[in-house]
Amino acid sequence: MSEQVETRLTPRERLTRGLAYSAVGPVDVTRGLLELGVGLGLQSARSTAAGLRRRYREGRLAREVAAAQETLAQELTAAQDVVANLPQALQDARTQRRSKHHLWIFAGIAAAILAGGAVAFSIVRRSSRPEPSPRPPSVEVQPRP
């Protein structure tokens, strides 16, 4: 927490600063008046340009919105056609599926799955039961009383 020491200006420094601001002041005022006249012209030109840009953007935006609405209407019509034809397409798909050839394919797949399950069951069953060793045991199996 440092204290800020405020240095006071001596009378000579105050006079020098005041004269400097007085000498620069009228130039700034003159420049400001000139810029005010030119600035108003520039400001009105900028405002006009901004208005033209805005009108151009709004016109372009309106055209883009109209094109998007037209595209959306076409997509909606296409979707309605698809939905209207959906029951007929489903009926056609069902009649094509009902062939005897597909029935045999499903029966073959079911038989293969059952055979695979039987093989997996026998492998698991054998792994849970230890196989007897062909060698005689090295330790007596029956404990002595």
From Swiss-Prot:
Coiled coil: none annotated. It comes from the Bacteria. It is a single-pass membrane protein. One of its GO terms (biological process) is cell division. GO terms for cellular component: plasma membrane. The chain crosses the membrane at residues 104-124. The keyword Transmembrane applies. Its main location: membrane. InterPro entries: CwsA. Keywords: Cell cycle, Cell division, Cell membrane, Cell shape, Membrane, Transmembrane, Transmembrane helix. It is found in: Cell membrane. Pfam families: CwsA. Required for regulated cell division, cell wall synthesis and the maintenance of cell shape. This is Cell wall synthesis protein CwsA. It comes from Mycobacterium bovis (strain ATCC BAA-935 / AF2122/97).
